[in-house]
Amino acid sequence: MKQGFIKVAAVTVDIRVADVWHNCKEICKRMKEAEKAGAKIIVFPELCLTGYTCSDLFTQDILLKEVRRALAKVAEETRHTEALVFVGLPLAIDGELYNVAAALNDGKILGFTTKTFLPNYGEFYEMRQFRQGPKKARVISYEGEEILFGPQILYQAAEMDDLVVSAEICEDVWSPIPPSIEAAREGAIILANCSASDETIGKDSYREELIKGQSARLIAGYVYANAGDGESTTDVVFGGHNIIAENGTILKEAKRFANEMIVSEIDIFRLLSERRKNTTFQTTEERHLPKVLFHINVEETALTRSFAQTPFVPQNMAEREKRCEEILMIQAMGLKKRLVHTH
């Protein structure tokens, strides 16, 4: 971390639908495993405290009250965890139900990031239970505490100013204008996504390209944690397809249908350097997104990611041949223009 490498984890847990305390126990267990692996940013799937597939059970008051108690337990567990943790849950506020990602650190709930885009097509019908999040974050009263609630909340490490994290939820990144765009423009260098993206033929490839593209477009790290086995299969099947990407490159990807935890390191110093050099990546002059501080220990990071000895030479032979042909064609076209001009 002292050299700019931040270890992150995307974790799929073994959930039981509507069994809040089983899910709480699994989240706490996997959180400790991620911390033991050195992760400073830990991301869990969408609605993982209850399961994404609770359907009309989401409207039951007893479930929502248990969610609050379980979230308090998970938050307390972070008091002994040097990490910023994102956990998905349903949250009832002012008579409305929202799909949120809670940010937890040092025993506290720092904020609730709301889902902006609710899918209501095909196999999805989230508008049946949930309300779309507000356009701007506001402060709400939650269990006697004043906590930020809304989209595009920025979480900044008190010990490392350049480490700014923001979250979005599943469908948000599939939308025409994801919330992460504005968050990145205001300084977020790592983006977390608590997701429940189902499996259909070919969707995994599209998902990979989507996450790669978003990390490249925003010159950022992207940590994508997906729901997996344990969800109801009445309408859909989830594969636990977790992805960690950095500036257009996938650093780590989970084997689908295995409920894995993946861990890798994101080089935020490199990302910051690339943003400074890229004049088209304009940060906003008027900053309006809310910011909350979190705490981590700044220490050496043990690297698990690999670095190619020949970074400009693709290891894949087909890609290498394509690259060589491209180089020759670029040179040939340049030479052709020169010869035509001088003769």
Where are these regions (language model features)?
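Enzyme catalytic cores with a strong preference for nitrogen-chemistry domains
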Residues: 1-343
